[in-house]
Every structure is written in structure tokens, then in C-alpha cells.
Design a protein with these regions (language model features):
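Metal-dependent active-site segment of extracytoplasmic phospho-/sulfohydrolases and closely related
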Residues: 70-113, 152
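Polar, surface-exposed loop/tail segments
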Residues: 147, 156-173
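Loop/turn elements at helix/coil->beta-strand transitions in domains of secreted/extracellular proteins
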Residues: 41-46, 87-93, 132-133
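Substrate-binding rim/cap in mid-to-C-terminal beta-strand-loop elements of soluble/periplasmic
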Residues: 116-156
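Active-site-proximal alpha/beta segments of enzymes that process anionic O-linked groups
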Residues: 1-37, 168-170
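Active-site His/acidic residue clusters
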Residues: 31-77
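Structural recognition of the beta-strand scaffold that forms the well-ordered cores
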Residues: 45-49, 93-96, 126-129, 151
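Solvent-exposed loop/turn segments at secondary-structure junctions
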Residues: 52-56, 99-103, 133-135
Length: 173
């Protein structure tokens, strides 16, 4: 690992552990590290994976609601972090989407780790895109996961030729 990256991650961990707020999830650690990396390096492309929503698999609805509230707060803070960075001003696009929907599983056997896939709703997912390069509105056509990748490539200036996915041109400026 590059020395500067190691130093940034170490500083983020230290602030996370010793900070004035008591962190209550690994997603908060993810946010703190992300905040430091954005502040220090302003990467052109970054993937942030908040994972605590998987608490839903435990079957405790109150924990799931807490995770949703936390996710809303951290996502808002992430957007604020992006907006405060002069390197991203009027340039950054932030797509927000769940980790995945589900592909069809003919067995419909309640799947691996309770990821049911026999239900059509398991194949639906949403995406929110904020910032430069996107416009307000909704996409009414059926969209596949590969379309999200094609859209990201278009935002990065690549045509994505040869890809199965089709960019969501209706949301792109």
C-alpha cells in the first residue's frame, strides 16, 4: 500500500476510534475512511460499499429501520463531503444504488443466505444519481444491472462499445 494512502487510512481509523461521536456501525468506519480519502486524494473514481443493510437478514425489523436511517444520514454526509471538495465542484456524479437485485432462480428455494430469488420483486432495484452529468427525472423502461455499468462508463467518457448494457441516456445531460 502506498505510504500516503496508508497514512490517510490510519488517520481516518484513529479519528473514527478516538473521535467525539461513538460510532455504532462499520458503515460509519467506511464513511470516515471515504471522507479522508476524498479530502486527501480526490480520486476520479471511487466505489463506496455500505454493507450494514444486510442486518435485514437477521429478521429484526427495528434494526433494519435503524440501518435505513443510518444509510440516509451517511449518504447525505457523503454528498456533503463531495460538495465541499473544490476538485469535485460541478464535476462529480454520485450514483447511489443497492448492492444488487437478484437474477431468476428456477429453484426459488429461498436461496443462499435467505436471498429469495423466485419472486419477481427480487429482480428489481433502484438507482439515484446526483451531480454533474445527470438530470432530474425517472427512467420508465426496464433497466438491467449491466445498464448501470454502461451509464457509469458514459459518465467517465467511454462509449462502452461491445458491452451488453445500454447507458441510461434519458438521465444523462
Amino acid at each position: 500500500m502506498d505510504h500516503n494512502v496508508r497514512e490517510t487510512v490510519t488517520r481516518g481509523l484513529s479519528e473514527y476510534i478516538n473521535g467525539p461521536q461513538v460510532p455504532n456501525s462499520g458503515d460509519e468506519l467506511t464513511f470516515y475512511i471515504t471522507h479522508e480519502v476524498i479530502r486527501e486524494f480526490s480520486p476520479r473514481l471511487m466505489l463506496v460499499n455500505f454493507w450494514h443493510m444486510d442486518v435485514a437478514h437477521r429478521g429484526t425489523y427495528s434494526l433494519y429501520l435503524q440501518a435505513i436511517t443510518r444509510m440516509d444520514r451517511l449518504t447525505g454526509m457523503l454528498w456533503d463531503t463531495v460538495q465541499e471538495n473544490p476538485n469535485y465542484l460541478d464535476k462529480a456524479t454520485v450514483p447511489i444504488l443497492p448492492e444488487m437485485g437478484r437474477d431468476w432462480d428456477a429453484n426459488a428455494s429461498n436461496g443462499y443466505l435467505h436471498h429469495r430469488s423466485g419472486d419477481a420483486s427480487c429482480r428489481n432495484m433502484w438507482m439515484l444519481a446526483l451531480g454533474a452529468g445527470v438530470t432530474a427525472g425517472e427512467t420508465e423502461r426496464p433497466v438491467e444491472h449491466v445498464d448501470v455499468a454502461a451509464t457509469a462508463l458514459r459518465l467517465l467518457g467511454s462509449s462502452g462499445s461491445g458491452m451488453k448494457g445500454r447507458a441510461l441516456s434519458e438521465i444523462l445531460i
